[in-house]
Amino acid sequence: MNKQLYKNLLANELTKIKKENRYRIFNEIKKDDSFPLAKKAYKNKFKDILIWCSNDYLGMSRNKLSIKRAKECLDNYGIGSGGTRNISGTHSPLVRLEDDLANLHCKQKALVFTSGYVANESTIGALTTIFKDSIIFSDEKNHASIISGIKKNKCEKYIFNHNDMIDLENKLSLVDINRPKIIIFESIYSMDGSIGDLAGIVNLSKKYNAFTYVDEVHAVGMYGKTGAGISEKLNLQNNIDIIQGTLAKAFGTIGGYIASDDLVCDAIRSTASGFIFTTSLPPLVAESARASIEYLKSNSELRIKQQENVKFLKNELLKH
């Protein structure tokens, strides 16, 4: 059997990626105890570096409380969860984590996924299946995971100009008031760091009878009195149908989630393939995430300091 055909196709794709300067090289990193100091592998040695590109925004991956709780959980539960949520993977730390996330966002229920990407792709895909003949309204700068979820069922969609409420309303006005509509947006956009117009979207959703879905991955842990994100800061949590977030950035662990009411979460857990057909998060990850959420709810110093640092650096850069 000649495999050269397949080798050529793979090599051609890599050549194309390299010509477009999209080929990625991974850096081997060894974290130090003091974030953001680290070491990078270089010619069989490690050299000291300062990390500017991490999404461990507050250094919570090295938080002593989170590490302590993870170690205790490891002793009590072992390493893996041992199954999907439908069989033996719904362990106590995961149940408590979902309770904590629901409480954080002032929602009835939360569901934890293996990543933020999976949370978006699976939930949006499930929604467009459940809401028959639905139409999506998506900000043009939404994340790849959102785009993938929208494409999953090839539903009808409108892409509105970034943060442009006039354009969004013009598109909403074209659709029958009784047709299912889902507005999907981010609270902080990874493409340019802009803040989403949450209040504007909430107002339009009420006017045009639309379901709202906000991605808060860059905001949870970072904004709001208890670290629940921009929706908390603007007191809009009760006006947004689904709040999606991650445990992998400010909370310093891994995993993604949605928070909503009982009915929504029950429907998603029963239909979203990315939730159903995969092994759940390990207990020690769930418990360390709980510790991070607990810490950031009652300690605002880290996020205040981070915002002060951002302001200082921005001002210094503007001088040069």
Can you describe what each PLM-predicted range is?
Residues T226, E232-A267:
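Active-site PLP attachment segment
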Residues G196, R290-H320:
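Conserved PLP-dependent catalytic core of the aminotransferase class-I/II
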Residues I124-A144:
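Conserved PLP-anchoring active-site segment centered on the Schiff-base-forming lysine
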